[in-house]
């Protein structure tokens, strides 16, 4: 598979980049905004990352590798999902890039996911990312206001 479509979603969060970064790399927080998913990694470049959970009654274990870490700025991972229906092989992995941009007391978080094979799949991924980012925003802004 070599997809030419990209999904992109962005959100502005009333929180410092430090807090947003923590939410991207803290398994307890990830579970709260990523559909109850358990994220397992040591968060070092070159390390694996595993996402485990149950979706619509079916257990899953998705995975990838951490390619780049720039704390409070950028996180780049590869990602493969069992739900893709594609074999677990390098050409079927997406690259997911999280970019943080601090502006005063707010952080703009942008997520891009590449190597998507169709516009329909890209639209679906973009919709999922929008939901995830809005949930993350609510979580962090609720923490910020308390």
Regions found by a protein language model. Give the residues of each.
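Surface loops and adjacent helix of pleckstrin homology
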Residues: 35, 54, 80, 112
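Hydrophobic-ligand binding "helix-grip"
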Residues: 39-42, 59-104, 114
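Hydrophobic ligand-binding cavity/cleft-lining segments
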Residues: 1-38
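Intrinsic-disorder/low-complexity, polar/charged segments enriched in Ser/Thr/Lys/Arg/Asp/Glu/Gln
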Residues: 4-10, 48, 61, 74, ...
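A conserved amphipathic terminal alpha-helix motif
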Residues: 2, 108, 114-146
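Hydrophobic pocket/interface hotspot
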Residues: 20-21, 30, 49-51, 66, ...
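Residues at helix-coil transition
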Residues: 25-26, 71, 141
